[in-house]
Amino acid sequence: MSPQLPYPELLQPLSPGNTVNAGIRLYRAHFKEYSGIAVTTVVWIAGLLILAVPIAFIFYAVLPPAIATLLILPLGFVLSFYCFGRYLAGSAAISRLVFKELLGEFETAKDAKRFTNARAWGFWVIGLILFALFSALIIGVYLALAIVLALIFSSLGGFAALQNNPFGVLEGLVRSPATAIALFLGILAIVVVFTIAWTWVAARFAITELPYGIEPETKPADSVGRSWTLTEKNAWHTVMVLFVSSLIMVPVSVVLQIVSSILQVILVGLSGSDNSAVLAVVYLASFALGMLGIVITLPIAQSIKGVLYFDLCNRREGLKLQLPRDEPRDKVPTDTTPVRSTLELFKKVTLLTPESVELEFILAGIGNRALALLIDNLLVLLGISFFWFFGTLFATQLVTVLSPDRYAVAILWFVAIAFLGTFLISSGYFVLFETLRQGQTPGKRFAQIRVIRDDGRPVGLTQAVLRALLRPIDDTFFIVGAVLILFDKNEKRLGDLVAGTLVIQEERMSTKRSIALSDSAQSLARQLPTLSDITQLQPDDFAVVREFLQRRDFLTAKARTDLSMNLARQTRTLVHLETIPAGVTSDQFLEAIYLAYQSGGT
């Protein structure tokens, strides 16, 4: 029998938002377990930082300074490596637990920590490899950029101008605004291209520690290469997942920073800024809050990375592309049932329409909503920037024709119009799209989610306006809305609660993706009903075959070959076919099975 799937919904690749949703869902389900690992992990770092000062004080108090320094440096180096190694190992243990659960190979926290702790030094090797790679990359890019700019500057006569008149270049730019603008745009383009390229490269190495922390046969150097392989064709998917997960953890950082600031103001205000004892308490409190922040955010981040690693393996290697059984129905024991987890990775809601029809939807979740909000806010910011830019140009021209005694009144009008326009753009954007596009803004469309009423009907103008008016409260540091979405049973923010709306996921229909079918497969499909028993295939079996055919071009070459041969062997056994006809590849056989099943096996 093939391994059963504890989460059948993971057969298809996850969207960036759902990757985050699944990670948070698993974190909440295993809060005690993952947080316990985070606490023990942070203790290694906190202990190192706390004990460093008294240890150094004792050494310098007992020994001569030169000898103390010679002893402290190697000792501190070894302790730092060991403690940070345990920190990295503990972080990887959380991702390992997530990956194992999604794979159906459940493991205890004790076993996961034992595995990663035994490899603690290897995580440092991975870090050193990355440091060397990125250092070489930075130096190479810097030198190449310097050479290119020097050649351009020289070809334009810049060096000669500097020798004759050091300020001549600046004077030339002042006399020629077009040249200055072109230079500015060129520099801006270089910065944008460099940022995009750097982000892409960073994404390719974003999961370097996970193969080493999860796969027993993987060495540190191999782990770096495996990250590069798995993120091929998925770099921007990885960027979106990591960016959204960072956005979700902003509220935690903001709240802790607010608490730290309030505590500092209170203590300093009561005792004065010159009181060294109070300052020590403030620093210790800030340190404790910082460690608390790591305890909260570390398991969230590592849970999401564990889901991301699983999803990348599924995308590139087809982890879930296995038939749930290897034998025909008449040979499978009657007491064998698919193993499903009792945990729902994606929360569902059942609505009753005015026509008394029950509809089931998957809620959008905080991951998809954060991704949509990010895109929408970028578009709103772009619109506001254009409004202020052209508004400023218009105001500047208008002021030149006004008399000086009207300047004060004009400025007040300009400010009022600016704020009114900003409000209309920021609120009207959401009202307009949600009303006219059936609850979808461009961001929601990208994230494949939409807003509906509590009874399943499309949102109207009233609901869209209420949601838009309350959005500033929900979006303040992403705190209010995020907290409500996480803890409300229907994942509603304040605007949803008042407007009576829900944010749901659109159904992702995998059948819409085209499948290239060969002539040989179509010919074999017509023969299969007489050569085999296609009725032995179950819908779940067909779904796996279809998923492979749709995704085979995105798999690695080795994974595609292995999966194709394995699925062909399993399917051949299921349909009682003795051998695959000569000259037919495993891919062509699966294509024929796909066609024959769709035709009803006749």
Question: Which residues fall in each region the model found?
Answer:
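Short, highly charged, low-complexity non-transmembrane loops/tails of multi-pass membrane proteins
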Residues: Y309-T336, A499-I504
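Membrane-water interface at loop-to-transmembrane-helix junctions
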Residues: W228-T238
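Short, small/hydrophobic-residue-rich motifs at membrane-helix boundaries and re-entrant hairpins
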Residues: S2-G104, R114, G122, I126-L173, ...
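Canonical alpha-helical transmembrane segment with a positive-inside/aromatic-interface signature
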Residues: F487-Q522
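Polar-ligand-bearing catalytic/cofactor-coordination segments
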Residues: I126, T231, N314
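Juxtamembrane/interfacial segments flanking transmembrane helices
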Residues: T108, F205, E217-G225, G318, ...
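Ligand/cofactor pocket segment of small-molecule handling proteins
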Residues: L466-G500
